[in-house]
Amino acid sequence: MALDKGTCLRYYKRKDIQEALVEHAGNKEIGIRYGDSFGKRPDILTYPKEVLELALKGATSFHCSEELWDNPLDLSGTSGKKELDGLRKGWDLVLDIDCKFIDYSKICADLIVKFLKKCELKDVSVKFSGNK
């Protein structure tokens, strides 16, 4: 089901959403989805106001790499492994709990978060993807 432009604009005009997206986008390549296709690569988000500007141009969602880059704009579709390894400065850890029972998934996610916090990780978040 496609999101209509009004729904996207109501969401992406929120300052808290704009700021959260830009904060999370730091040192990451951003993929901007326009309906059924993605925008140009590579791309980045730098300023909160860019989020609304892109939504006004038809952006329906924002996606980011798990990889952290020295400069995401240096990426190229023709870059080889050695070149990419030289540009990469780290990774986000993403754990995908793939279970058909949501209650089991919640228990598992809760235990993982508690463990990571016990290990003194500070930036831990959980996202439900809609069971897809």
Please describe what each predicted stretch is:
Residues 106-119:
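Short amphipathic alpha-helix segments
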Residues 121-126:
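A short linear hydrophobic-aromatic micro-motif
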Residues 128-132:
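Short, conserved phosphate-binding/catalytic loop or strand-edge motifs used
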